[in-house]
């Protein structure tokens, strides 16, 4: 009886290392396809000898593919598990593998983009920038090391998880489990960003409303900013943040928003209604 072909930790680790170069051959014809095939080579070499089956496997992973680059890891793992079953004649064929990839890349992208691009990266960048603004070199280092620690952990453990779970991973994507995870991460990110906006954003309107001289002869000057702070501290930074968020939702180019803020700030200081 022929011995079953099994992937070892060596092939899994090699796939993990290669996954860091997924976008090295990014192109607009097949997007991540060449990188995907490159990652799968250690598993394919282990499971298939030289010949038609190996060639078919390589061609299978040159098909169009695009999803979140960090969360390709569990898809790599599932693909490796299915290729292993196919190599051992367990009833899996090439169409099933391709179908699985197509079926997972959409939901995975829907999870990865809001969690990593929309939450983790901005929050870490904000924390690093807050330290950097104070002249602390730990700011950029904190951002770099924490972000890459999360990236590498996601790739490594995601790959192992996908390989161990195989097609059972589809059950984890079912229901509203992923939706709850995404919503929770988004709420956490908004909470942190809200706190940082209050700390960073400074808007001062120095227009004088009144001058009152007390009994000692001291003049108490009230400005628009003093009045606003007495009603609701941080109202202007909050309003600016909500305005920018609304403009982004309406599809306004972020570069135009940034330039607009610069122009208003410079003109406001020159005209004397901002300080």
From Swiss-Prot:
Transmembrane segments: 100-120, 127-147, 187-207, 227-247, 255-275
Keyword Ribonucleoprotein attributed: no
GO CC field: plasma membrane
GO BP annotations, alphabetical order: phosphoenolpyruvate-dependent sugar phosphotransferase system
Sequence ranges assigned to domain PTS EIID in this UniProt record: 5-274
Membrane-topology annotation of the record: Multi-pass membrane protein
Main localization, broad class: membrane
Organism superkingdom: Bacteria
Domain notes for this protein: The EIID domain, with its homologous EIIC domain, forms the PTS system translocation channel and contains part of its specific substrate-binding site.
Protein function: The phosphoenolpyruvate-dependent sugar phosphotransferase system (PTS), a major carbohydrate active -transport system, catalyzes the phosphorylation of incoming sugar substrates concomitant with their translocation across the cell membrane. This system is involved in fructose transport.
Name listed for the protein in its UniProt record: Fructose permease IID component
Native source species: Bacillus subtilis (strain 168)
Gene encoding the protein: levG
């Amino acid at each position: 009886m022929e011995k079953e072909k099994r992937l070892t930790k060596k092939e899994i680790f090699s796939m993990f290392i290669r996954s860091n170069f997924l976008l090295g051959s990014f192109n607009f014809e097949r997007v991540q396809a060449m990188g995907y095939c490159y990652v799968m080579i250690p598993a394919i070499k282990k499971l298939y000898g030289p010949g038609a089956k190996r060639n078919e496997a390589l061609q299978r992973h040159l098909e169009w593919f695009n999803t979140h680059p960090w969360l390709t890891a569990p898809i790599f793992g599932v693909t490796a598990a299915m290729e292993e079953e196919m190599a051992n004649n367990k009833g899996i064929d090439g169409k099933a593998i391709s179908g699985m990839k197509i079926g997972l890349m959409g939901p995975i992208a829907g999870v990865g983009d809001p969690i990593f691009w929309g939450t983790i990266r901005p929050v870490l960048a904000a924390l690093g920038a807050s330290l950097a603004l104070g002249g602390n070199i730990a700011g950029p280092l904190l951002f770099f090391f924490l972000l890459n620690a999360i990236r590498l952990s996601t790739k490594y453990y995601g790959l192992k998880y996908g390989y161990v779970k195989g097609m059972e991973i589809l059950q984890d994507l079912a229901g509203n489990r992923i939706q709850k995870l995404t919503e929770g991460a988004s709420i956490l990110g908004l909470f942190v960003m809200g706190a940082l906006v209050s700390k960073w954003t400074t808007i001062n309107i120095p227009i004088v409303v009144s001058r009152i001289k007390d009994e000692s002869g001291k003049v108490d000057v009230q400005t628009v900013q003093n009045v606003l702070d007495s009603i609701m501290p941080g109202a202007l930074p909050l309003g600016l943040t909500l305005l920018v968020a609304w403009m982004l939702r309406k599809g306004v180019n972020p570069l135009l928003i940034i330039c607009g803020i610069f122009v208003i700030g410079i003109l406001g200081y020159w005209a004397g209604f901002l300080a």
